[in-house]
Amino acid sequence: MASTFTTGFGIEKIGSGEQSGAWGTTTNHNLDILDRIASYKAVALSGSTHTLTVREASPGSGTENLQDGMYRVIKFTGALGANNTVTIAPNTAPAYFIFENATTDSGSSGPYSVILTQGSGANITIQNGKNAIVYCDGAGSGAAVVNALSDLQIATLEVTGAATIDGVTT
């Protein structure tokens, strides 16, 4: 049986009897993927677009499968002169993230936002200095990026310190 790859992160499932004497390399690579899922990465943005790859569209053996989009917590850095649209690829890869927009202004017209997209579906805009928890549905060309905390249902909320609600600080 030939090796196959998981659809989420391209983790290689070694076929029965394959890779005799070499399976350790594949296993270590798979462990590197799992480590990224539980880790943090700062990603420097520049210009007005960036592609954040979750996994290769057609994964193969080797470290070329390791992608920045495998990290679940990503801090966007870099000096922007305009809003930056980050495309999460491929559009068939479902994923979730915690993002921070820690970019700076390269001129005097900012601060600038990071716009997250995966397909023609919904997009999310993260304002400068803000964080978001999002998920990508991986629905192909119509894929959407969704704010996981929109319409948040909370039974009881306790706030210590100031709270800003609809622009009013209490």
Feature map (PLM): residue ranges:
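Extracellular "spike/adhesin" assembly and maturation modules
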Residues: 1-63
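Acidic, glycine/polar-enriched metal-coordinating patches/loops
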Residues: 2-9, 77-154
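Generic, well-ordered alpha-helical segments
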Residues: 19, 27, 66-68, 80, ...
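Extracellular receptor-binding modules and their adjoining Ser/Thr/Gly/Asp/Asn-rich linkers
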Residues: 30-45, 130-145, 164
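Intrinsic low-complexity, repeat-rich intrinsically disordered segments enriched
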Residues: 41, 45-51, 117, 122, ...
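Glycine-rich, flexible loop motifs
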Residues: 50-83, 93
